[in-house]
């Protein structure tokens, strides 16, 4: 059994981790930390886990995290990098759901997250946690910085158009002019109290935010450049807040080059993802819905070419708390410990 600890178990990604790991046949939950809720039974805070998780929240000092095989950080940015060095020294693997180990450039990290990175040597060895792209590296990793929710949808939506193994080295699209129009449910903002996510503010409302620049932008650009194998990437990324709890819907717009105008893109996507257990390339003309993946680790993609013109539209949906966060973390953990990738992640989406 894999002994698992969770640092920061009181937020939405934390409880989602608990839900998934409590059902995982190869996991023993050994510690869940919270400084503010230490001593409280987990099931008291989250009644949905009653009878499934018997642990109490503990302080990080009492949790004996060094005795775990792997520790998940479902914490604000900056926490994982402060504790990773000691855990790694004790042979504990680290999976961070925040951004501490995503951006490889420490200056970019400081610019977008407002803090200096205090362990660049660990950042250098960290693997970006997007299994469909970095599977082999994740298998050998000690530290994984999980891909963000928006970045997961955008990168998986565009990978078949950029990856040389799919394109044969041809530039099928103008990579310098990509548009991502992305929408998220309110759980993406976390569990903290904020005016913008209060029911009276978010319900019956729809708005864009961070149009000037969202902190996921450099992460997406970094990932797309790595997938393409070149730096000729330009992205306009505009996120929106929608009046729903879970879900991300990204509508991606790309312009085809002359080399890309005679390609069967439905077939291209189907071939690229044919062996991926969590990626569903839907039939031509489909319109995926966020509720079709709610509570599951699946991601659904549909390809459109309006009027047969030179614009390709890719629709992508995922559950931001599962494939966009905790489920992807479990998927990476499975790879790191040599388990089948789908172990503990076969939940069917909840509908309605």
Curated annotation (Swiss-Prot):
Q: In which pathway does it act?
A: Amino-acid biosynthesis; L-arginine biosynthesis; N(2)-acetyl-L-ornithine from L-glutamate: step 3/4
Query: Where is it found, in Gene Ontology cellular component terms?
Result: cytoplasm
Q: What is its EC number?
A: 1.2.1.38
What are the subcellular locations of this protein?
A: Cytoplasm
What's its catalytic activity? N-acetyl-L-glutamate 5-semialdehyde + phosphate + NADP(+) = N-acetyl-L-glutamyl 5-phosphate + NADPH + H(+)
User: Could you tell me which Pfam families the record lists for this protein?
Assistant: Semialdhyde_dh, Semialdhyde_dhC_1
Q: Which GO terms describe its molecular function?
A: N-acetyl-gamma-glutamyl-phosphate reductase activity; NAD binding; NADP+ binding
Respond yes or no to whether keyword tRNA-binding is given for this record.
Answer: no
**Cross-referenced Gene3D superfamilies:** Dihydrodipicolinate Reductase, domain 2, NAD(P)-binding Rossmann-like Domain
Residues forming the catalytic site:
149
Q: Tell me, in a sentence or two, what this protein's role is.
A: Catalyzes the NADPH-dependent reduction of N-acetyl-5-glutamyl phosphate to yield N-acetyl-L-glutamate 5-semialdehyde.
Cited NCBIfam families = argC
Recorded hits in PANTHER family, A to Z, give: N-ACETYL-GAMMA-GLUTAMYL-PHOSPHATE REDUCTASE, CHLOROPLASTIC-RELATED (PTHR32338:SF10), N-ACETYL-GAMMA-GLUTAMYL-PHOSPHATE REDUCTASE, CHLOROPLASTIC-RELATED-RELATED (PTHR32338)
Protein name (database record): N-acetyl-gamma-glutamyl-phosphate reductase
- Organism expressing this protein natively: Polynucleobacter asymbioticus (strain DSM 18221 / CIP 109841 / QLW-P1DMWA-1) (Polynucleobacter necessarius subsp. asymbioticus)
């Amino acid at each position: 059994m894999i002994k698992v600890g969770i640092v920061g178990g009181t937020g939405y990604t934390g409880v989602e981790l608990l839900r998934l790991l409590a059902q995982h046949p190869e996991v023993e939950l050994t510690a869940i930390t919270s400084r503010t809720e230490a001593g409280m039974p987990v099931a008291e805070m989250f009644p949905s886990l009653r009878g499934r998780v018997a642990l109490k929240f503990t302080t990080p000092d009492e949790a004996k995290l060094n005795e775990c095989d792997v520790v998940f950080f479902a914490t604000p940015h900056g926490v994982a990098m402060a504790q990773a060095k000691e855990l790694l020294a004790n042979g504990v693997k680290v999976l961070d759901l925040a951004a501490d180990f995503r951006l490889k450039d420490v200056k970019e990290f400081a610019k977008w997250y407002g803090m200096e990175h205090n362990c660049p040597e660990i950042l250098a060895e960290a693997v970006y946690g997007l299994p469909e792209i970095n599977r082999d590296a994740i298998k050998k990793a000690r530290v994984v910085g999980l891909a963000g929710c928006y970045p997961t949808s955008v990168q998986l939506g565009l990978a078949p158009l950029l990856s040389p193994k799919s394109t044969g080295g041809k530039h099928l699209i103008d990579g310098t002019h990509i548009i991502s129009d992305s929408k998220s449910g309110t759980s993406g903002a976390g569990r903290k109290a904020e005016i913008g996510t209060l029911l009276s503010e978010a319900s019956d409302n729809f708005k864009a935010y961070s149009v000037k620049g969202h902190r996921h932008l450099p992460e997406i650009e970094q990932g797309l450049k790595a997938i393409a194998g070149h730096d000729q990437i330009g992205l306009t990324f505009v996120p929106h807040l929608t009046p729903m709890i879970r879900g991300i819907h990204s509508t991606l717009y790309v312009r085809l080059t002359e080399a890309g105008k005679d390609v069967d893109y439905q077939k291209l996507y189907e071939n690229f993802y044919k062996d991926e257990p969590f990626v569903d390339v839907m039939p031509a003309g489909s319109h995926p819905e966020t509720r079709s993946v709610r509570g599951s680790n699946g991601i659904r993609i549909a390809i459109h070419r309006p009027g047969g013109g030179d614009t390709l539209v890719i629709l992508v949906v995922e559950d931001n708390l599962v494939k966009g966060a905790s489920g992807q973390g479990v998927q990476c953990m499975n790879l790191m410990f040599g388990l089948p990738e789908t172990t503990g992640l076969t939940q069917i989406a909840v509908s309605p």
